[in-house]
């Protein structure tokens, strides 16, 4: 689960917001994970794919302003200091970085007000030991905490053998995305780390969803969905295993062997690797018309895959 760090700076003195209402002395902001089962409106802010506000793609012409808002969302719950913000936006900050940042924050407030009057007031200026900027937002107004909660819920169901419940939770998780994360963001070290982490988390969620779908017997159109994700991440071995398994479970030996051959050629030509053992095992199952073995192979990977993904969660809104 994503946990929001508190706003207290390392020296113990609390920053205070400068805006419509100053934060009280000693004020801290803690994020509580949203209840995954309540009926809530769509998140106000979205970063899972294209940056969006109220479900609409954010019409911010300046890529730096989009980066400012994205950084504040990823670090929701505490301000970002001026010096750190400069390092986030530029690997080699210009001399005018502070002035540029101030100008972009002012412009971003106007952009937010155009989407929703008064929304720009959420962008706060902080004074004191942690002089900087931050976005006042509750975790249930933001799509990333919802995604993290749904993925964790789905993995728990998957590990417990409740495959249909796992499918439902993981469908909810992947449904929050509208494309890969990181579009139009500056290619700085900070953003590149978050881009890699979040996009891997998205692919992990799809992989778990496809695994749960196979085990739940929900395989209609599943091969098509797996193919679309393989097109994005062609070197994920488990996706190829799942695709071969779906065809094998449908009794389509020709399609199963075609998948195996495509995988073998790709791994050999691009990576210099032999056919992975899991794919070879699926080929044998198809040749033997052994659907039970194909299902057993998928089930045997469930624990291993889920436990691996437990250690590779979306990056915390910090660092």
In which residue ranges do the predicted regions lie?
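Extreme N-terminal targeting and regulatory segments of eukaryotic proteins
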Residues: 25, 31-37, 71, 82, ...
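Intrinsically disordered, charged and Pro/Gly-enriched terminal/linker segments
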Residues: 74, 94-98, 125, 131-319
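DNA-recognition element of transcription regulators
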Residues: 61-70, 94-116
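Short aromatic/basic micro-patch
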Residues: 47, 79, 141
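DNA-binding patch around the recognition helix
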Residues: 34-45, 105-138, 268-275
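Short amphipathic alpha-helical recognition elements used for nucleic-acid or partner binding
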Residues: 58-89, 108, 238-241
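Short boundary/linker motifs that mark transitions into or out of structured domains
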Residues: 1-66, 124-132, 314-319
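DNA-binding alpha-helical recognition surfaces that contact promoter or target DNA
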Residues: 87, 103, 110, 258, ...
């Amino acid at each position: 689960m994503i946990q929001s760090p508190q706003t207290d700076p390392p020296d113990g003195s609390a920053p205070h917001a400068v805006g419509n209402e100053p934060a009280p002395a000693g004020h801290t902001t803690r994020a509580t994970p949203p209840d995954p089962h309540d009926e809530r409106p769509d998140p106000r802010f979205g970063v899972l794919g294209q940056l969006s506000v109220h479900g609409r793609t954010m019409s911010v012409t300046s890529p730096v302003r989009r980066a400012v808002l994205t950084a504040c969302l990823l670090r929701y719950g505490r301000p970002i200091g001026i010096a750190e913000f400069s390092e986030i936006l530029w690997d080699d900050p210009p001399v005018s970085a502070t002035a540029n940042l101030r100008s972009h924050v002012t412009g971003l407030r106007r952009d937010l007000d155009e989407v929703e009057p008064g929304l720009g007031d959420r962008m706060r200026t902080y004074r004191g030991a942690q002089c900087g900027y931050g976005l006042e937002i509750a975790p249930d107004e933001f799509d990333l905490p919802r995604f993290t909660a749904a993925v964790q819920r789905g993995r728990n169901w998957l590990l417990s053998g409740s495959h249909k419940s796992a499918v439902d939770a993981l469908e909810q998780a992947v449904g929050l995305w509208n494309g890969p994360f990181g579009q139009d963001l500056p290619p700085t070290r900070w953003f590149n780390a978050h881009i890699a982490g979040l996009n891997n988390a998205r692919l992990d969620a799809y992989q778990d969803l496809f695994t749960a779908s196979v085990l739940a017997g929900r395989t209609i159109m599943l091969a098509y969905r797996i193919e679309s994700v393989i097109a994005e991440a062609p070197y994920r071995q488990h996706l190829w295993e799942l695709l071969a398994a779906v065809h094998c479970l449908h009794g389509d030996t020709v399609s199963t062997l075609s998948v195996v051959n495509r995988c073998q050629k790709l791994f050999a030509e691009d990576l210099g690797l032999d056919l992975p053992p899991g794919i070879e095992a699926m080929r044998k199952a198809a040749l033997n018309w052994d659907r039970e073995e194909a299902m057993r192979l998928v089930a045997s990977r469930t624990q291993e895959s889920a436990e691996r993904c437990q250690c590779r969660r979306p990056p915390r809104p910090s660092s």
